[in-house]
Amino acid sequence: MKTFTHLLCVLTLSIVLFACNNAHFLKEESYRNQVAQDFEQKKQALPHGDLFAIFGDSALSVYEREALMFLYAYMPIGDVTDYPGDYYLENVRLSKQTRDEMPWGKEIPDEVFRHFVLPIRVNNENLDDSRRVFYDELKDRVKGLPMKDAILEVNHWCHEKVVYRPSDARTSSPLASVKTAYGRCGEESTFTVAALRAVGIPARQVYTPRWAHTDDNHAWVEAWADGHWYFFGACEPEPVLNLGWFNSPASRGMLMHTKVFGRYNGPEEIMLETPNYTEINVTENYAPIAKALVTVRDRNGQPVIGARVEFKVYNYAEFYTVATKSVSYTHLRAHETC
């Protein structure tokens, strides 16, 4: 009887392990096929060297292989060539570990996790090992907190590490920002997004190309909790979410947008799709919006299909383009403004 029970336990464990090793990261078949196609195109574009050698590792689980395929399919070419496959595999495993360990991990939809937790890159910073470092520092600080309180706590931690200082150099990496202890808004928001993702909280950097009220721009953070996106100033802790010094300027802004890693099919308006990212319009998180229908006609009164339409705001003594659309057959696509 003991032998039978032991065999039954071993069999059950084997089944569980088999199921875990064969669980999909990309659960939707049509999306999985699209990612596989984009990945093959990336491989064909980079046929030399051993840039994709990590995929030859027979020990990779289905989950790990698909997560790596997603990252490689849409990462910039420089990220393929500059960092080894083991680096990306470690980050895949860390993100999964965090999702399994954090109480909110199971609440995050797969699509949200895929685009706003797994990706390492936020802006044009150098990539580093911040996910592991930040997780080790933050896991006990957010332990037992509801998700929204955890977001606030992470931002308090970020404020302890980095303060604002203007600069014009390339965006510093998250660990470099900790070392210098300062950064401009784009660096503070890159750092904060990395910290939130390190503890499994979906986050994205939001940017307004130009303000309507003053000659400047700004970047901050949105984090996902309980089915909604909330905004706040990076390294600028407040007692609640959706509160920052920029509430009023953002309510008058012409555009707030973010670049999402990979092919993204979320509810927001898609402004631009590239081989690496999807640019989306998040203005409605800050102000009432409406559709502006622009018609372009030739001298005969006929619609000019494909005509380029630029939406501009006056800033720095010039009309600055914040969004570009083109005339389509189905309808003249509108840009959402407040």
Question: Residue locations for each model-derived region?
Answer:
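Short amphipathic beta-strand segments in non-cytosolic proteins
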Residues: 307-323
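Extracellular ectodomain segments of secreted/surface proteins
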Residues: 266-293
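Secondary-structure boundary elements
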Residues: 27-30, 37-180, 215-216
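Hydrophobic/aromatic-rich core segments of domains that either
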Residues: 140-141, 145, 150-156, 165-175, ...
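Single conserved hydrophobic/aromatic residue that forms the stacking wall/gate
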Residues: 331-338
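C-terminal motif of bacterial Sec signal peptides marking the signal peptidase cleavage site
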Residues: 18-19
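A short, amphipathic beta-strand motif
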Residues: 290-298, 330
